[in-house]
A protein has these predicted regions:
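Bacterial N-terminal signal peptides that target proteins for export
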Residues: 2-9
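C-terminal motif of bacterial Sec signal peptides marking the signal peptidase cleavage site
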Residues: 19-22
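N-terminal, intrinsically disordered, polar/charged segments of Gram-positive cell-envelope systems
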Residues: 24-74, 80-81
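Short, hydrophobic/aromatic-rich segments at coil-to-beta transitions
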Residues: 56-61, 94-98, 153-164
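Secretory pathway targeting signatures of secreted, lumenal, and periplasmic proteins
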Residues: 65-120
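Surface-exposed amphipathic alpha-helical segments
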Residues: 75-78, 183-210
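Short, surface-exposed beta-strand/loop micro-motifs that present aromatic residues
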Residues: 98-103, 172-182
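Signature of long, low-cysteine stretches enriched in small and polar/charged residues
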Residues: 127-178
């Protein structure tokens, strides 16, 4: 499920916050509280049919054989969000695209692994994301909003990526997205941090699953 992200810098010096606008689904007729609960649980089960796309979490290591990636949270000085927590968030937000999340203990960095809708046009997705970031942060001034797309080498292959930097005063907020494709499946690794080196360290903790 595609998400559009808004980067905002605010706070005492400046606090950076990622605003997530989730895509909506068709409205359902109102039912009793118990019926609503049953629908949510059923919806979750339907979306989780392809367990290979979900990947596998073993302690602090996440593996996804479909996209041939493995992420070691400890290697990036991060803590993995448990599968139970991700399941709870998925049900709560009625969004089942998030498959893995890890957060750092010190620098406030975060990495997500999300599976997008099959057949997602990556270049169109990136173009829309870039336009959203520029529009939502134009108040900072063009010189303080840097966002671009490029092709990078990731785990030995060329992949599409997006890099964004928002600056206010002495604080810069960084975000990097790396897009992976496997047949008709599309996934994105997203890293957010106020430390540029942490972005590289986090991506460096990804290896091939095989």
């Amino acid at each position: 499920m595609k998400k559009n992200f808004k980067l905002i810098i605010m706070g005492v010096a400046v606090l950076s916050v990622l605003y997530i606008t989730a895509c909506t689904r068709k409205d359902k007729a109102k039912e009793s509280a118990q019926s609503d609960k049953d629908i949510v649980v059923k919806s979750f089960a339907d979306d989780k049919k392809n367990t290979e796309l979900d990947g596998k979490l073993d302690g602090e290591v996440y593996t996804n054989s479909v996209f041939n990636i493995k992420f070691d949270a400890k290697a990036a000085n991060m803590e993995m969000t448990s599968a139970a927590e991700i399941n709870a968030m998925s049900i709560s937000h009625n969004d089942y695209s998030l498959k893995m999340e890890a957060k750092s203990r010190d620098s406030g960095s975060r990495v997500n692994f999300t599976v997008l809708d099959d057949g997602t046009d990556v270049k169109s997705y990136i173009d829309e994301d870039i336009a959203t970031i520029k529009e939502e942060n134009k108040g900072l001034g063009d010189e303080n909003v840097k966002v671009e797309s490029s092709t990078i080498n990731f785990l030995g292959g060329d992949v599409e990526s997006l890099h964004a930097e928002l600056t206010s005063g002495s604080v810069t907020y960084y975000r990097k997205k790396v897009f992976l494709q496997s047949d008709n499946h599309v996934a994105v690794i997203e890293v957010n941090s106020q430390d540029a080196q942490s972005i590289d360290n986090c991506l460096g903790a990804f290896t091939k699953a095989e």
